[in-house]
Amino acid sequence: MISKAPARICLFGDHQDYLGLPVIACAIDKYLTVSGKPNQTDLLNFDLIDLNRIRSININSDLSQIEKGDHILFVLKTLKSHGVIISKGYDIKIKSEIFINAGISSSSALIVALINFFLKIYVPEKVSTKYISELAYESEVLQQGGSGGKMDQYSISNGNTIFLETGVNNNFKKIKSPFKNFIIANSGVKKHTDEILFKLKIKTLDAIKNICNHYPTLKLCEIKESQVNDFREIIDEKSFKYFKAAIKNHSITLDALSELEKDKPDLIKLGKLMIKHHNVLKNRLRITVPKIDRMIDLAKKNGAYGYKIIGSGGGGSILILAENKFQQKIISDLKKMGVNQIIKSNESPGILDL
């Protein structure tokens, strides 16, 4: 049995999913692969190839006390809570093409691939990718007390490019993407995802809570950019900055959706919207670091028509959109800057079974 789950990039809507606002995200054709076969023991033997580690877990292990970040055990706990009981041992290999701790969801890919692996073995009927998304979200966020939203799990499980409404219903629709040959470059600056997400989430939610105390029926998704200053007197200046950034990013995401749904989307217009989104992340939420800023400046000077930081920020990767004739120069100059992990990728259909 082989289960493959892709990386993901957020095109529009970073730092929106945990607010219940929509995102546009894309699964890309770089994969984490889980492969395995049964053994004659009660052990799940994990060969973590990229980490050069072997880990063995007894299928009867107590799962009541698990350290946060132990994604394998949390997957087993989540599956068990949904009636998926692993009844025999397996020798399992895990190998990945996905940059680790770089903003393209290596952890979520691991969780989705493992869940899909065990569901294929123990659940005879076909399950929906939305169900896998929900199990992955439960395992990574709810069980572990994480601060993220549902973008990663839904994007990876369902594949392609999706517009995801991250409110109560988690409705999503697939969008035909005009983008080809993404450049993704990892800064190598280690980030602390949950800490960053928690801080920004708390600040923004506090601002929204204070506003809703004055306007109990108000819905964040219904606030227009033109209305933002109406709320300035209700909250302090710092909170207002985060609130304003959330509304701006929401507006950009909806504008991008409108363009993407056209028969012939304008790539230059989409690139400009992406740059606007990046500028909010950089200047209002302040999630970039100096190396990321230098990488972005390099892409801009070398002809990129779109660019942004990917993920929670504080390090990680950038996404670059550029015509083919500019791509090699961008990649070459990034390498000269000391950026060692650079890939070109395209859209992925999502989970693969082999």
Which residues fall in each region the model found?
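FabD-like malonyl-/acyl-CoA
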Residues: A109, S317-L321
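Structural signature of FAD isoalloxazine-binding scaffolds in flavoprotein oxidoreductases
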Residues: G20-Q40, N158
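Cytochrome P450 core scaffold surrounding the K-helix E-X-X-R motif
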Residues: D14-H15
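A generic structural signal for short coil/turn motifs at secondary-structure boundaries
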Residues: G20-P22, I100-I104, K191-E195, K282-N283
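Glycine-rich phosphate-binding loop
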Residues: G314
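C-terminal nucleotide
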Residues: M1-C10, T33-D70, T78-S81, S155, ...
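Gly/Ser-rich oxyanion-binding loop with an adjacent helix/lid
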Residues: M1-I9, Y18, E67-S177, K300-K301, ...
